[in-house]
Amino acid sequence: MTTPCPCGRTSANSAKPAKTQPLPFFACCGPYLNESVPAPDAHALMRSRYSAFVLQRADYLLATWHASTRPAALDFAPGAKWLGLDVRSHRVLDADHAEVEFVARCREAGRATRLHERSRFVRESERWFYVDGDQF
């Protein structure tokens, strides 16, 4: 059995169109986190960054954070369990700028929380980077 991607992206099952199957990690965010290929757009980068949070991959998160806003280091909340990602919208502003609005659900210290953010992304040298975001 293959491991489903943490981002939760699904693919319609051709045998049963009403049912969706989670994409396996190796066919979804895996190639981005393994640096085989760069994320092709801001939407894919957003999903891969969520997967990196689930997998506690600070190296990938820092590498995909724009240098102008990148922190020196990342700390993960101990015991935090990411529960799901809902991408609400992906808006291309121009060839090198985009926004992605999402809600990420998490359980921390037994308490459910959600992060609702509109993130800004920029493309430089054919690579997309997270810049910052507005939380709701």
Swiss-Prot record:
Task: Please give the InterPro entries that the UniProt record associates with this protein.
Answer: NTF2-like_dom_sf (IPR032710), UPF0225 (IPR023006), YchJ-like_M (IPR048469)
- An example Pfam family from this entry, by short name, is YchJ_M-like
**Its domain of life?**
Bacteria
Q: Which family does it belong to?
A: Belongs to the UPF0225 family.
Protein name, UniProt field:
UPF0225 protein Pnap_0466
Query: What is the organism field in this record?
Result: Polaromonas naphthalenivorans (strain CJ2)
